[in-house]
């Protein structure tokens, strides 16, 4: 999983996470996320928040948003709900957002990514990918993955930033 993690954007140089900083984590969609938060907390301070607590985040904070899709079978839908898209749009107006997609990169197909400064694809929502993604965000492992598919005209196969 470590080699697969793909960094698509990091415009504000938010990665790797800084151990002395405090970050906020907002899990969206339906699948488990706890392993990711636990592993991020090994290297920095993470405040887990719910959708209802978004307004309490100080402006210009860094918020990690995880799209946790159930991908236990290929027949599960990869699309992100409109509610999650709306939350992401609102967050990116006042916060520095790191979006991590734990599922198909096609989830990004109809999301406006222009205002999101950092985007990663971790491909699967399981304990191994969550641990690998946390290590990558903390700078403990190199990020070198490339998109294996064409998502849309802006996200083509082979896209990926090494960090």
Describe each region flagged by the PLM:
Residues 1-163:
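Preference for extracellular/luminal or secreted protein segments
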């Amino acid at each position: 999983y470590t080699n697969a993690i793909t960094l698509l954007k990091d415009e504000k140089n938010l990665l790797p996470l800084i151990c002395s900083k405090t970050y906020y984590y907002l899990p969206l969609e339906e699948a488990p996320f706890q392993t990711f938060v636990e592993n991020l907390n090994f290297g920095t301070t993470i405040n887990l928040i719910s959708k209802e607590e978004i307004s309490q985040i100080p402006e210009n904070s860094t918020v990690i948003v995880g799209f946790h899709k159930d991908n236990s079978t290929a027949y599960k839908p990869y699309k992100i709900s409109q509610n999650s898209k709306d939350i992401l749009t609102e967050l990116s107006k006042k916060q520095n957002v790191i979006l991590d997609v734990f599922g198909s990169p096609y989830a990004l197909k109809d999301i406006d990514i222009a205002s999101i400064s950092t985007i990663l694809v971790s491909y699967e929502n399981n304990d191994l990918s969550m641990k690998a993604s946390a290590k990558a965000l903390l700078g403990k492992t190199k990020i070198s993955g490339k998109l294996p598919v064409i998502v849309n005209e802006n996200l083509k196969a082979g896209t990926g930033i090494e960090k």
